[in-house]
């Protein structure tokens, strides 16, 4: 079973060209299924049936796994069985018809506009790490990049003269995004410093040894910036969520935000309308005289 799982992961990496981050998440989920099969003495993927998979989902849910995590696991299983069926190694899909237990819809965490400006407008020290990290933060917030898109960014994808960046998104789909003035300025300060490392390839963001920064290194630097400037936990996707929320709040153009984010399904983008409504409700509660009267206890 593990050999076939290895072959599937190689297929995802080489033929489907999924990002390392996505591949790691799929492998982690499928390893849970593999461990369950070994424990239940299920000796092949062909022998795993819908009842056994349903039992695993129930156990993981009882152990605290979120509905979203279980949905991703089922998606990984469906992908595996699609591959196994295509290769003639199986003739069924135990995940067919299964859905995870429903859970509360969690809204993405964002920074409000003031907090985003507080993060980005602080004084930047004149050194390698400070200029690099500032360029990373500005680009995340300016263009709404995914972590995998930023780590994979090469010099030939940047056009600072026209203020554009071309990124390779999920499913190897490319899209061209605007780069704001502040992000362009930060990149123009960073790129000459990058050359001092004699970089090994064309990566935009490199370490002091000239090697491309990986996802974990960028997560660590973003987290450090959040703790230093805001006193809170911060991760790259929070900057992407903030970009989306602030763009939608200003433009009210859901389709445009969908294109900028690279979402194939507008339903994925619609979650930001809930954030926008949440903001409007807060403004209403604080500003509308009738809302204030209700809060004051008048009837």
Swiss-Prot record:
* Localization (cell): Cytoplasm
Gene Ontology MF annotations: DNA binding; tyrosine-based site-specific recombinase activity
Q: Does the keyword Secreted apply?
A: no
Respond yes or no to whether keyword Cell cycle is given for this record: yes
Question: Any idea where the Core-binding (CB) domain is?
Answer: 1-85
Alphabetical keyword list:
Cell cycle, Cell division, Chromosome partition, Cytoplasm, DNA integration, DNA recombination, DNA-binding
User: Primary place of residence?
Assistant: cytoplasm
Q: Which Pfam families match?
A: Phage_int_SAM_1, Phage_integrase
All copies of the Tyr recombinase domain together span: 106-285
Gene3D superfamilies tied to this protein: 1.10.150.130, Intergrase catalytic core (1.10.443.10)
Assembly and binders: Forms a cyclic heterotetrameric complex composed of two molecules of XerC and two molecules of XerD.
Q: What does this protein do?
A: Site-specific tyrosine recombinase, which acts by catalyzing the cutting and rejoining of the recombining DNA molecules. The XerC-XerD complex is essential to convert dimers of the bacterial chromosome into monomers to permit their segregation at cell division. It also contributes to the segregational stability of plasmids.
Q: What is this protein called?
A: Tyrosine recombinase XerC
Q: Which organism is it from?
A: Pseudomonas fluorescens (strain SBW25)
What is this protein's gene name?
Answer: xerC
């Amino acid at each position: 079973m593990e050999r076939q799982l290895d072959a599937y992961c190689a297929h995802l990496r080489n033929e489907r060209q999924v990002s390392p981050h996505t591949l790691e998440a799929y492998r982690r989920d499928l390893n849970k299924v593999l461990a369950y099969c070994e424990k239940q003495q299920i000796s092949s993927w062909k022998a795993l049936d819908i009842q056994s998979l349903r039992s695993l989902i129930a156990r993981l849910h009882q152990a605290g796994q979120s509905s979203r995590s279980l949905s991703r696991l089922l998606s990984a299983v469906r992908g595996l069985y699609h591959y196994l069926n295509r290769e003639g190694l199986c003739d069924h899909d135990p995940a067919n018809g299964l859905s995870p237990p429903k859970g509360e819809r969690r809204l993405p965490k964002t920074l409000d506009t003031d907090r985003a400006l507080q993060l980005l407008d602080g004084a930047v020290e004149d050194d390698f790490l400070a200029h690099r990290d500032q360029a990373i933060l500005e680009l995340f917030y300016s263009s709404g990049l995914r972590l995998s898109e930023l780590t994979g960014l090469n010099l030939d994808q940047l056009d600072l003269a026209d203020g554009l960046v071309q990124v390779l998104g999920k499913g190897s789909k490319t899209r061209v995004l605007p780069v704001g003035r502040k992000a362009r300025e930060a990149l123009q300060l960073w790129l000459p410093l990058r050359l001092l490392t004699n970089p090994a390839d064309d990566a935009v963001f490199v370490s002091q040894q000239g090697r491309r920064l990986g996802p974990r290194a960028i997560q660590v630097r973003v987290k450090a910036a959040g703790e230093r400037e805001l006193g809170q936990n911060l991760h790259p996707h929070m900057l992407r969520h903030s970009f989306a929320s602030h763009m939608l709040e200003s433009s009210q153009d859901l389709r445009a935000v969908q294109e900028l984010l690279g979402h194939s399904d507008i339903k994925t983008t619609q979650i930001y309308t809930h954030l926008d409504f949440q903001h409007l409700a807060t403004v209403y509660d604080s500003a509308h005289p009738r809302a204030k009267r209700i809060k004051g206890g008048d009837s």
